Amino acid sequence: MAAKGLLVMDVDSTLIEEEVIDLLGEKAGMGDKISEITAAAMSGEIDFKESLRERVALLSGLPTTIFDDVYKEIHLTKGATGLIETLHAKGWKVGLVSGGFHEIVDKIARDLKIDYVFANRLSVENGHLTGKTHGTVVDKDFKVDRLKQWANENKLNLSEVIAVGDGANDIPMLNTAGIGIAFCAKPAVKAAVSYHIDKRNLLTVLEFVDKLADKE
């Protein structure tokens, strides 16, 4: 059955309350340093790719068993499950495209029955993080490409896509979708995007689903 619409979401501080790399940083004893770089990247003060390299380098030596510990500390944003279940019932597809890590995002996607997911992957040797990423880096341009690909796979126009995110890395994706929503976002993001949600309840996105239906 053809999809009725597509929702593409960021993960850290959007679908979930936390920034996973900050939680990993705490485990590495680098919490304050990594959180500082994350904040600068999300507000657009520094380049995302460079910030990712800097932060991942600080995780070098962590055992891969740390992912299970971090996953237990993650909280879905209020309304996340209800939003996704409602959209699936309406015939929509849901995709996650994250500057975070497959090692965590895949588990979230599985639990929520997400249709599509793409994130960064951390390089591992002998059961420990090397301090580098492996494969394609999910940056702002990649997020746009993935949104377009998923829309195309479902024979949807971009006008039938909603995107939700909170960081500077999300701005091009938000402006590519028919409706792009800055979710509890940094000022620079809100200034660049037409639609905003300022309360941490993802069920509010359903109001924009109705708005999209009204456009048709």
Curated annotation (Swiss-Prot):
Catalytic activity, EC: 3.1.3.3
Reactions performed catalytically: O-phospho-L-serine + H2O = L-serine + phosphate; O-phospho-D-serine + H2O = D-serine + phosphate
CDD domains, per database record: HAD_PSP (cd07500)
GO terms (BP aspect): L-serine biosynthetic process
Entry binding sites for Mg(2+): D10, D12, D166
Pfam families reported in the protein's UniProt record: HAD (PF12710)
Cofactor: Mg(2+)
Binding-site positions, substrate: E19, R55, S98, G99, K143, N169
Classification via InterPro entries: HAD-like_SerB (IPR050582), HAD-like_sf (IPR036412), HAD_sf (IPR023214), PSP (IPR004469)
Keywords assigned by UniProt, alphabetized: Amino-acid biosynthesis, Hydrolase, Magnesium, Metal-binding, Serine biosynthesis
Region forming the signal peptide: none
Protein's pathway: Amino-acid biosynthesis; L-serine biosynthesis; L-serine from 3-phospho-D-glycerate: step 3/3
Disulfide bridge positions per record: none
Catalytic residues, chain numbering: D10 (nucleophile), D12 (proton donor)
Keyword set includes Magnesium: yes
Gene3D superfamilies: HAD superfamily/HAD-like
Claim: Magnesium is one of the keywords in the record: yes
GO cellular component: cytoplasm
Molecular function GO labels: L-phosphoserine phosphatase activity; magnesium ion binding
Family according to the record: Belongs to the HAD-like hydrolase superfamily. SerB family.
PANTHER family the UniProt entry points to: PHOSPHOSERINE PHOSPHATASE (PTHR43344:SF2)
Protein name as annotated: Phosphoserine phosphatase
